């Protein structure tokens, strides 16, 4: 039993080091996982086939806002811009995806692939800012 205790304390030591690396992980997530608000754009389509067409356009190099204007069924904002959204103001799967994405720009968007399914339909999401 004492060796187990020793390895347990060894684990605690490692745990201390791991917590150090946890803070490093949190710093590494800074551009990705942190913050309480994200500036989001999305493309929303009810039909899977249509969202996949939009995905192909994005992959071929078409700008995100142009694809959103052409394909998105969410007419609330042109270009798919939802503005700043806070944690808790988005549906679960959309929020998880939005906070997992790195910040990117129109020229080289990083977006959800495959699209995210919610009760509203299928979303391709990109994040333009985080705070």
Swiss-Prot record:
Annotated catalysed reactions: [protein]-peptidylproline (omega=180) = [protein]-peptidylproline (omega=0)
Region (Disordered): 1-39
EC number: 5.2.1.8
Alphabetical list of Pfam families matching this protein: Rotamase_3 (PF13616)
Tissue expression as described in the entry: Isoform 2 is much more stable than isoform 1 (at protein level). Ubiquitous. Isoform 1 and isoform 2 are expressed in kidney, liver, blood vessel, brain, mammary gland, skeletal muscle, small intestine and submandibularis. Isoform 1 transcripts are much more abundant than isoform 2 in each tissue analyzed.
Keyword terms of this UniProt record: Cytoplasm, Cytoskeleton, DNA-binding, Isomerase, Mitochondrion, Nucleus, Phosphoprotein, Rotamase, Ubl conjugation
EC supergroup of this enzyme: isomerase
Record bears the keyword Ribonucleoprotein: no
Impact noted for substituting residue 19 to A: Abolishes phosphorylation and strongly reduces nuclear localization
Chain intervals for the UniProt region annotation (Necessary for association with the pre-rRNP complexes): 1-41
Family: Belongs to the PpiC/parvulin rotamase family. PIN4 subfamily.
Functional summary from the UniProt entry: Isoform 1 is involved as a ribosomal RNA processing factor in ribosome biogenesis. Binds to tightly bent AT-rich stretches of double-stranded DNA. Isoform 2 binds to double-stranded DNA.
Subunit note: Isoform 1 is found in pre-ribosomal ribonucleoprotein (pre-rRNP) complexes.
Protein name per its UniProtKB record: Peptidyl-prolyl cis-trans isomerase NIMA-interacting 4
Organism of derivation: Homo sapiens
Taxonomic path: Eukaryota, Metazoa, Chordata, Craniata, Vertebrata
